[in-house]
Amino acid sequence: MAHKKGQGSTQNNRDSIGRRLGVKKFGGEFVRAGNIIIRQRGTATHAGSNVGLGKDHTIFALIDGFVKFERKDKNRKKVSVYPAA
């Protein structure tokens, strides 16, 4: 005999909140040192020139400059920051 009567639909109605991941500064945008460029899980995009990689794989600017997305090789992306000339 069931101990709970017909309440399966209410038990299954939960969802986790979004983690606010993704690109925060896009290509060509000006960034200041310390600005977050990408929040990600794992290194989907790798760190290029003048950017740092946080322990949670967040990519952030180390200098003031412009964001540039590039290809590292055939199937890897990287992001760099180049100073304003």
Curated annotation (Swiss-Prot):
Disulphide connectivity of cysteines: none
Protein name: Large ribosomal subunit protein bL27
Residue spans crossing the bilayer: none
Pfam families: Ribosomal_L27 (PF01016)
Gene3D superfamilies listed in its UniProt record: 2.40.50.100
GO molecular function term, any single one: structural constituent of ribosome
Superkingdom, natural source: Bacteria
Source organism of this protein record: Campylobacter curvus (strain 525.92)
Gene Ontology terms: cellular component: cytosolic large ribosomal subunit
Keywords: Ribonucleoprotein, Ribosomal protein
Record's keyword annotation contains Ribonucleoprotein: yes
Listed InterPro entries: Ribosomal_bL27, Ribosomal_bL27_CS
